[in-house]
Swiss-Prot record:
Pathway: Amino-sugar metabolism; N-acetylmuramate degradation. The gene is murQ. It comes from Cutibacterium acnes (strain DSM 16379 / KPA171202) (Propionibacterium acnes). The keyword Lyase applies. A lyase-type mechanism (elimination/hydration) is suggested for the cleavage of the lactyl ether bond of MurNAc 6-phosphate, with the formation of an alpha,beta-unsaturated aldehyde intermediate with (E)-stereochemistry, followed by the syn addition of water to give product. Belongs to the GCKR-like family. MurNAc-6-P etherase subfamily. Specifically catalyzes the cleavage of the D-lactyl ether substituent of MurNAc 6-phosphate, producing GlcNAc 6-phosphate and D-lactate. This is N-acetylmuramic acid 6-phosphate etherase. Residues 57-220 form the SIS domain. Pfam families: GKRP_SIS_N.
Amino acid sequence: MDSLTNLATTEGRNPASEELDQLPTLDVLRLMNDEDHRVPDAIASQLPAIAAVVEAAVKGLSAGGRLIYAGAGTSGRLGVLDAAECPPTFSTNPTMVVGLIAGGQQAMFQAVEGAEDDADRGAEELNVLQPGPHDVVVGLAASGRTPWVVGVVRAAKRAGAVTASVCCNHRAVISSEVDLPVEIDAGPEVLTGSTRLKAGTVQKLVLNMISTATMVGLGKTYGNLMVDVSPSNEKLRQRAMSIVMAATGCSCDDAITALHEAGGHAKTAIVMVLLGMTATQARARLAEVGGVVRVAVDENHLRL
């Protein structure tokens, strides 16, 4: 066992769970719940570092770049999950937010042994995407030293991309490799070394923050409404209708009519209702202001 493993919080034993195998089920659950409560406070201390990643992503995506997550195991699966949720939630192109996982698609469903140990393979898989200076590449590694992930961020840096990382140990190897490190220590796991637990929760919450705050920065919300939702199923069509009603105060019938004329696009429908425009006029108005509803409907920004 090397010194890095000895120092890693994610590999440490949790004194509170040393008798785990002797506890009644309810006590096991209480213990896990208590430990999970440590996660938000641990994240809170790193909000400025997370904000720096978001600001870089907003800048890069605004210039046509991509947000690329890369991880192995649980970390990789969470990155793929977050990326996959962006198109239906924000109508993004599937290439705008991308998730890479060591071992490829198969690794989403079952472990691919040894995949995470190949740094060269990580670099090769990133290079397939031809990263550039407008891209932001975020390495996800609970330990902060997964070779495949380190290989990815090194390749990203060589290509001139902005690099970031999210890990759950202090003074992690990957932190010294990236421009924007995020280190969140939520303490050792209830089940020693099982980083699918608190470390996984840390990464899920941070990814939620990165993607959501980035999309807010790109103008894909109006207030707290997901006005760029893609109405690709009945639930989302109903949501789009509710969003138009909430944003404008219009009736259900008026929202349905506006959405029909807008081709299901909630942003267009909102501008139509608020400004009394046709769908064509509303689309043109949104195009003038980069698709930001707040600016589109603000009288101070309307052309005289």
